[in-house]
């Protein structure tokens, strides 16, 4: 996947630790302590690095290893605020912390738009996608005041409609594709399932067993993959899959990924032996589990 001129890959070394300060989190399975928005994490060093980075999952902070800012951190730090940190210019801190999550959302949309422009079957909408990408890039490049004035929900909805059209053009090549948009597949037994071209936009797949499943050309925008088993699954051509979704899931050495994404460091280097799929997997429910907030960046928005 190509990316636009803005860097959409996180570069923590060029960021002022914004995700460790701007965002709140609550003590629970993802974080060991409570932290209010705008308060530096107790593990954040004076050089804006994490003091327990190599031990986050072992010390009660797995949520930190899941989060991905799509490069918003370094953009806000080095471009929007010209390289002056919130410690150097404390009067700018509150505004910087407000701007960061807005830019993060815009960068996420840029990621999706850039990916959609690589889909050959979506050529009929490439012109609209390119214009949307340019507009989103313009919004993210604004001043702090301009960024805070962006109507993100309205812009996201307009982009979402374009992405859906692109997705439908690509997935049309797959006959008898499954329709699970927004479905409750919590803990579903989908081991070895043929989900090629499936619509899984916004689906709740928490703790679902997708080991050995074929997810090529499946639309995964906003799918909640927390603790989903992706061992041996084929995600090589999955649509709109993000690093945050992979980070939240469980995979192994046999999980096949798109070239643009990295294998999470906490995944094992070995491959799971995949027995035959158990029968009787439950059908999806139509209701949805409530979405938790916080820093984890769990992308269930469509």
What is the meaning of each model-derived region?
Residues 290-296:
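Intrinsically disordered, Lys/Arg-rich low-complexity segments
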Residues 35, 289, 300-301:
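Context-gated lysine
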Residues 1-127, 132-148, 152-158, 162-173:
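Hydrophobic scaffolds flanking metal-cofactor catalytic centers in soluble metalloenzymes
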Residues 1-4, 85-91, 274-290:
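Intrinsically disordered, low-complexity linkers and terminal tails enriched in Pro/Gly
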Residues 164, 171-284, 298-302:
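Tandem repeat scaffolds
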């Amino acid at each position: 996947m190509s990316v636009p001129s803005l860097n959409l890959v996180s570069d923590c070394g060029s960021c002022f630790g914004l995700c460790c300060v701007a965002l709140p989190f609550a003590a629970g399975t993802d974080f060991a302590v409570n932290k209010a928005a705008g308060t530096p994490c107790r593990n954040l060093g004076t050089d804006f690095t994490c003091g327990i980075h190599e031990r986050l999952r072992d010390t009660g902070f797995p949520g930190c290893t899941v989060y991905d800012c799509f490069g918003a951190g370094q953009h806000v730090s080095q471009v929007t605020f010209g390289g002056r940190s919130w410690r150097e210019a404390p009067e700018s801190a509150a505004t910087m912390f407000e701007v960061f999550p807005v830019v993060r959302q815009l960068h996420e949309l840029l990621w999706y738009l850039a990916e959609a422009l690589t889909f050959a079957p979506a050529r009929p909408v490439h012109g609209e996608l390119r214009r949307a990408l340019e507009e989103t890039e313009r919004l993210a490049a604004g001043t702090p005041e301009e960024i805070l004035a962006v109507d993100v929900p309205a812009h996201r909805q307009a982009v979402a409609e374009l992405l859906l059209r692109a997705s439908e053009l690509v997935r049309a090549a797959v006959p008898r594709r499954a329709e699970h948009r927004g479905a409750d597949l919590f803990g579903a037994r989908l081991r070895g399932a043929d989900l090629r071209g499936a619509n899984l936009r916004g689906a709740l797949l928490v703790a679902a067993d997708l080991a050995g499943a074929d997810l090529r050309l499946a639309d995964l925008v906003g799918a909640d993959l927390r603790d989903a088993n992706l061992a041996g699954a084929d995600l090589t051509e999955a649509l709109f899959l993000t690093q945050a979704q992979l980070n939240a899931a469980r995979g192994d050495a046999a999980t096949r990924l798109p070239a643009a994404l990295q294998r999470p460091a906490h995944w094992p280097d070995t491959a799971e032996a995949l027995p035959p799929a158990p029968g009787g997997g439950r059908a999806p429910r139509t209701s949805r589990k409530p979405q938790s907030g916080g820093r984890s960046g769990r992308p269930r928005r469509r």
